[in-house]
Swiss-Prot record:
Subunit structure and binding partners: Homodimer.
Pathway involvement of the protein, from the record: Pyrimidine metabolism; UMP biosynthesis via de novo pathway; UMP from orotate: step 2/2
Natural source organism: Aliivibrio fischeri (strain ATCC 700601 / ES114)
Keywords: Decarboxylase, Lyase, Pyrimidine biosynthesis
GO terms classed as biological process: 'de novo' pyrimidine nucleobase biosynthetic process; 'de novo' UMP biosynthetic process
The UniProt record lists the keyword Secreted: no
Gene this chain is encoded by: pyrF
Protein known as: Orotidine 5'-phosphate decarboxylase
InterPro entries per the UniProt record, alphabetical: Aldolase_TIM, OMPdecase, OMPdecase_AS, OMPdecase_bac, OMPdeCOase_dom, RibuloseP-bd_barrel
Length: 234
């Protein structure tokens, strides 16, 4: 199966609505992201429903805790059979290393383990508000390097940082990019955004796209158009 680049962010507070949407799209066209709200509302059974329909799932819970607790949460995600799971890189090297090591018994079946650097809604004044006198891009570089040194597979980052991180950390280090909006789509609450083609060209490996697909009249068509546009740069 080809490596789908698009990850559709499912942001629903009603499980029936979510599954109605999911049944309109093809598992060969994308992967799905389940975040905190949906997982808190619907739990592991919802992830199982997505797996039954043939979708790979990115469990976007951004674990951040002491190493023992965080690593056990990551192991629970692996037991669920998800394709990708993430942790906050600001949790530090010991937390990330413990989370990576606990996945060793799963071999090639283990989920990709991704670090979260700087949330795409954060600007320099937001970082200053939590005591970090540093530009977002510099904090991303610092946390991404820490993530790689901890043995993780990649990071979540904005597309603007993708080319820099590929140059610094190598082509094998996976970059997962939210804040992606097809040309002409509403920006929403993401501060640092880019189109799908621009993001892949810049070095992003996977693109997280939500409302432009989930709120489309014909989500399957939107997905096909995005994938066709990406075919020219892959």
């Amino acid at each position: 199966m080809k490596d789908q680049k698009v990850i559709v962010a499912l942001d629903y507070d009603n499980q029936a609505d979510a599954l109605t949407f999911v049944d309109k799209i093809d598992p060969s066209s994308c992967r799905l992201k389940v975040g905190k709200e949906m997982f808190t509302l619907f739990g592991p059974e919802f992830v199982k429903e997505l797996h039954k329909r043939g979708f790979s799932v990115f469990l976007d819970l951004k674990f951040h805790d002491i190493p023992n607790t965080c690593s056990k949460a990551v192991r629970a995600a692996a037991e669920m059979g998800v394709w990708m799971v993430n942790v906050h890189a600001s949790g530090g090297e010991r937390m990330m290393s413990a989370s990576r090591e606990i996945l060793e018994p799963y071999g090639s079946d283990r989920p990709l383990l991704i670090g979260v650097t700087v949330l795409t809604s954060m600007e320099q004044q937001d970082l200053a508000g939590i005591g970090l006198d540093i530009a977002p891009q510099e904090q991303v570089k610092r946390l991404a390097a820490l993530t790689k040194n901890s043995g993780l597979d990649g990071v979540v980052c904005s597309a603007q940082e993708a080319s820099m991180l590929k140059a610094d950390l190598g082509k094998e280090f996976q970059l997962v990019t939210p804040g992606i909006r097809p040309a002409g789509a509403d920006v929403g609450d993401q501060k640092r955004i880019m189109t799908p083609v621009d993001a892949i060209t810049a070095g992003s490996d996977y693109l997280v796209i939500g409302r432009p697909i989930t709120q489309a009249e014909n989500p399957s068509q939107v997905l096909n158009e995005i994938n066709l546009s990406l075919a020219s740069v892959l």
